[in-house]
UniProtKB/Swiss-Prot annotation:
GO terms for molecular function: peptidase inhibitor activity. Its main location: cytoplasm. It is found in: Cytoplasm; Endosome. This is Ubp4-interactor sfp47. The modification Phosphoserine is found at S221, S226, S235. PROSITE patterns: SH3 (PS50002). It comes from Schizosaccharomyces pombe (strain 972 / ATCC 24843) (Fission yeast). GO terms for biological process: ubiquitin-dependent protein catabolic process.
């Protein structure tokens, strides 16, 4: 037996209608949070796309519009949680505890207040149609289990279905979202730079999603920033010696201008060629002192052999290759001077040239990784480091080696 009198349960609103109302509010809160999360994800995906200059302002404006819609969905979820769901929680728990077919007058009044708070937020025009709880209001509450728009009853002056309560105010937010996404779909810049956007296989545009924001399949993952290791190469510009010992690696190849003889046995440990500086490896270039690879000297065993062994052992033969077609370094530098005089955008090795600069002051290298500068030297920039030390080489009046130089000693040239 509950403590409520029979007069308290004289209303015609069922307990099932009260539970249906709470379930509808919970679904609405869940949808608001889902929409907000999808809008935030879409904004993040748009910002992650590598944009060209004409699209920067457009994407920035679109992202602002999307985040405004995201903010409205979050505000709606907080409002429904505080003023609609939490307001009814005590009454719903109490009615379910006593398991009565109808609810008390106090619960009915709380239900009407909760519905009024919901309608005030979703569509204020319905507020003028609400009256003091009456028979028509009870019919409205009992109709909450209907999921489709109900037909207009002649006996009800102001019919309000669950469908109209849930979707009455979504048009305003969806229109704002559609305008933001239409900027991307209708922009001529998008058509020019991203033609695949208009040729989507599914044929669905973003502005057609009236309530549920679908993921954009044209968004590509950000370009990986991890450096790629390049195969060490040798260049006559970077090398100071033309004598190389044949590396004992199967399938190894040397530059075409060198013709080496066949391998010969030797007790000498072969020198390792110095790898060229990797332009794309930003992590190695962030340090002022670049690693200097020094050739290892040959180590021979201690002299403990017998006299007979020494007499029979042949003298060691050094595997020094002979150049059948020697390369004239002067001709090579002359060709490089002519090449850089045309101001190309890439080096002969295929690396990009970011700028041409002129030395304003003379600089004497203090580390092996640095290069000397003379006043009015012309250099090409192969890498700009954040610490102010740039990587490049002098190309006029002579061609030098690749190394680091201070960026405050130069001025950029325009060609």
């Amino acid at each position: 037996m509950n403590s409520f009198s029979s007069n308290e349960y004289s209303t015609e609103i069922s307990t099932e209608a009260l539970n249906n109302w709470q379930q509808l509010v919970e679904q609405r809160i869940s949808l608001e949070l889902e929409y907000a999360a999808k809008l935030a994800k879409l904004t993040k995906s748009i910002k992650a796309i590598k944009q060209c200059a004409p699209l920067n302002d457009l994407t920035k404006q679109v992202c602002v519009e999307l985040m405004q819609c995201n903010k409205k969905h979050l505000e709606a979820s907080r409002y429904f949680q505080t003023h609609v769901k939490e307001f009814m929680k005590e009454y719903v728990d109490r009615e379910n505890k006593f398991s009565n077919e109808t609810i008390s007058k106090s619960s009915a009044a709380a239900l009407m207040t909760s519905m009024e708070n919901f309608i005030l937020f979703t569509n204020p025009v319905y507020h003028n149609k609400l009256q003091v709880p009456s028979k028509s209001d009870m019919e409205i509450a009992n109709s909450l289990k209907i999921t489709q728009p109900a037909e207009k009853n002649s006996g009800t002056a102001n019919p309000i279905s669950a469908y109209s309560l849930e979707h009455a105010e979504l048009d305003e937010r969806n229109n704002q979202l559609s305008e933001a996404l239409s900027m991307l779909r209708l922009s001529p810049f998008v058509n020019n730079y991203y033609p695949s956007y208009q040729n989507r296989k599914d044929g669905k545009s973003l502005m057609e999603n009236r309530g549920v924001v679908l993921s954009v399949d044209t968004v590509t993952s950000p370009i990986s920033q991890s450096p790629k290791k390049l195969t060490p190469t040798t260049s006559p510009i970077n090398s100071t010696s033309l004598s190389f010992v044949d590396a004992k690696k199967p399938g190894s190849k040397w530059p075409s201008q060198y013709d080496f003889p066949k391998k010969t046995k030797s007790t000498e440990i072969p020198f390792k060629t110095l790898p060229s500086l990797n332009i794309n490896n930003e992590r190695e270039l962030t340090k002022h002192k670049l690693p200097i690879v020094k050739p290892k000297l040959a180590v021979f065993p201690s002299n403990q052999a017998t006299a007979s062994t020494l007499q029979l052992a042949p003298p060691p033969v050094q595997a020094i290759p002979t150049l059948r077609n020697p390369v004239n370094l002067d001709d090579k530098k002359e060709s490089l001077l002519k090449y850089y005089a045309t101001h190309p955008t890439i080096t002969p090795d295929g690396f990009p040239i970011f700028a041409y600069v002129r030395a304003l002051y003379a600089y004497k290298a203090t580390l092996p990784s640095e290069i000397d500068l003379n006043v009015d030297d012309t250099l090409v920039v192969l890498n700009r480091q954040k610490d102010g030390w740039w990587k490049g080489l002098v190309v006029s009046p002579t061609v030098g080696r690749i190394g680091l130089f201070p960026s405050n000693y130069i001025e950029e040239l325009e060609y």
